[in-house]
Every structure is written in C-alpha cells, then in structure tokens.
UniProtKB/Swiss-Prot annotation:
GO biological process, one term: arginine biosynthetic process via ornithine
Enzyme class of the recorded protein, top EC level: lyase
Entry keywords, A to Z: Amino-acid biosynthesis, Arginine biosynthesis, Cytoplasm, Lyase
Protein name stated in the entry: Argininosuccinate lyase
Subcellular location per the Swiss-Prot or TrEMBL entry: Cytoplasm
Species, as recorded: Bacillus cereus (strain ATCC 10987 / NRS 248)
Pathway(s) served: Amino-acid biosynthesis; L-arginine biosynthesis; L-arginine from L-ornithine and carbamoyl phosphate: step 3/3
Amino acid sequence: MSKLWGGRFTEEAEAWVEEFGASISFDQQLVNQDINGSIAHVTMLAKQGIVTKEEAEKIKIGLQYLLEEAKQNKLHFSVEAEDIHLNIEKMLIEKIGEVGGKLHTGRSRNDQVATDMHLYLKEKVEHIIKATKQLQTVLVHQAENNIETIMPGYTHLQRAQPISFAHHILAYFWMLERDVNRYEDSLKRINISPLGAGALAGTTFPIDREYSAELLGFNGMYENSLDAVSDRDFILEFLSNSSMLMMHLSRFCEELILWSSQEFQFIEMSDQYATGSSIMPQKKNPDMAELIRGKTGRVYGNLFSLLTVMKGLPLAYNKDLQEDKEGMFDTVKTVEGCLHIMAGMLETMTVNKEKMGQAVTQDFSNATEIADYLANKGLPFRQAHEIVGKLVLHCTQKGIYLVDVPLATYKEMSSLFEEDLYEVLSPYAAVKRRNSAGGTGFEQIEKALEKAKGLTKEVIKN
C-alpha cells in the first residue's frame, strides 16, 4: 500500500523493515483515545473555519462509526499502516472518501500520540486510584477485626515488641494512602493537552488549542510546543509512582508468605489464592503473593527502561519514543491485576490469632517493658537497658522467659523491682500502654481507624 507520508520516497521499504518499525501491535490499545482526540481536533478545525462544518460533520460521523467498531473489536489493523494514527486515518478515508484526509490539518502524529497517551493515563490512573482505595477498605475491615489480636513486632526479622495486628495492617494502609496522594498529584501533569503543538514548532493554521483541550477534558495545555511533543515525564512519573506502589505490595506479600509458612502459622491463605505441588501432596503454596512480589521487578524494569531511553534524546520527537508505550501498557495491566489479587487475598485469608498470641508469650519481646518500668522509677534508661540485658541472658541460660523469673532474682539485679513488675510483662498490657500518638495502643488504633474510614468513605458508599 502507498504510505500517507510516501511522497518524498521512490523506493518501498522491505517487509521486515516495515514490521520492525511498526507499532500497531501494541499502540492499537490507544484506539479510543486516538479517535476521541481526532473528534475534538476536527470540531476545533470547524469552529476556526479551517474546515467547513459539512466536512467536519462528515469526518465526525466517520470517526464515530470507527469508534463503535473499535468498541466491538471489529477494526482490522495493518502493519503496513504502521501505527494507530495512520490506521485510523486510512480507515476513515476508505469510509468517507478523500475529505478524511483533512482531519490531519494543523496536527502532527507527534502531538497526536502525546495527546493519546495523556488521555490514556488520565483514565488508567483514576482506575488505579479507585482500586487502591478498594484495597484500603479491605485493610480497614481486617484491622477492625484484629484490634486486640496481639502479635510480635519485628526488627531485623527478630521479635522486638508486641503490637496489635491491626497496627501492622494499618501501616500498609498509610503506605497506600501516600501512593494514592502521589497518583492524584500526578494528574495535575497528566491532565494537560499537547494537542496543537504540531511536529515541534506549532502550526500556521489559526487553531484554538484551549478549545480542543476543553473538549477533551484537559485542565490546561503545554506552554511550549517543543516541550509538548518531547515530554515523557508524565509517563516516567506514572512508572515511578507505580514502582513505589508495587514495592509496598511486595513488602506486604513477603510478610504474608512468611506468616503463612509452618514456621510462623500466623495466617492461612484461602484456597482461592493458593496452589499445590505436582509432586508433594501436602503443599499449599502462596503463589499469588509470590507473583505480586515477582511482578514488582517487572514494573521497576519498565521505569528503568524508559529512563534509559530518554536520557540521551535531543528535542523533539525521535523514533526511540516508540519504546515509551509497551512498558506503560504493561505497568497498567500489572498494577491493576496485582491490586485486584491483593484485595481478594487479604479479604479471604484466615488470621490465626491463637498462634500470634502464643508467639508473644514465648519470647523476650516484653524486655523493653521492664526497661521502661525501671526508667519510670527514676533509673536512667541506659542503666535499665543494661540490667534487662543481663536478665535476658540469665533467662536464655536457664531456658526460661522473663515472666518465669522469681522476684528475688529481679531484686538481685535492682532494688527498684516490686511485685507490680509482673503486670507490665503481659503482652496485652504492653500493647495497651503504648498509647502515644500513632502508636500500637488500642485507643490510638481506634483513632487511626476513624481517620482511615474517613479517607475511604466514598469507596465504601459505592
């Protein structure tokens, strides 16, 4: 077929060269955005008198037809037409005649593709925000059911201090809230229009960029035409935000994987989110959590790939920028899928409250309570720390825990110890007392839950 840009050329490219340079295999995902952008563009052209109202109406009817065909997956794309833009233009001309060729007046594929991607990411980021909020509601529900579920808190993966399981869950709620905030802030930069920037220098036609931006729901437009067609910051920001979100999901999945093991037994995954072994009949593997953890590296890779593409590009458009789309599409699909799986996995998991409770009665995570006990009686904390360290050593040598140590032995270490010491050794009491703002104390968790519910109330309504 003859190329829409073929006037300059006397030889046709080899078939394998065409295939190598074509992007239609993946940028066809922008079909809705491309057609909607074209409808806005031709509407603006008619308003400005650049095309007649009759021509614009004919073009819009043709575009609406193609849009309906696209929604029903009836469009057939060709590698020969290279990309989504030329495929749609070719189909339009075939449908309505040569007047379809006027659609591209005052526009380049450079500003066209940038517009498509802005529209695409605007829609997808809003979907991801909603999915993240839905995951947050699951976390809130689990936290509500586990306020007084006591578990070991860890540092260095060693038992550190007893905490409420709800407190641990809500830590991830607030991580996700920051992710939501980043996505929401990024919409300020996504929701601006490059349409009308042309190839790089604007156009000689009397276009109205503000009008076309308004038609497409953009809040503004790029101030510089070179920047408009060269910018991929908005995609990089999306990939960066998605990498952080996936990092948070991955960290949680790592803990879920550990907790579901025989060594912990803190939780059990629903059969819906676990798999078995082809050789070992007893196995119940946390495959979904492992996949989310694994797919995090995939999203990181998409970010680093585009950063590497962009680092050496002069202004304005270069064919390298064709490589900006597959990683973006892949990240959208990956993040949406992981959020959906994560929500279902957390909603259906069984929390083994008894096992968690046993864990904090058979360790030394209450050691800090004794140090605080002595400090509250006036002993410098560093001295209290030393005394309790010796008590822990004594216990490990005897094969006992702090609650088993007789008062007489405590008094040998410090005369400040009294019978009330044993009250502070209770893991439940230890958690309850940590009532500083943002702490694991039950009152603080109730306050945190109220805030969390306020941030997810719109999702809960829907």
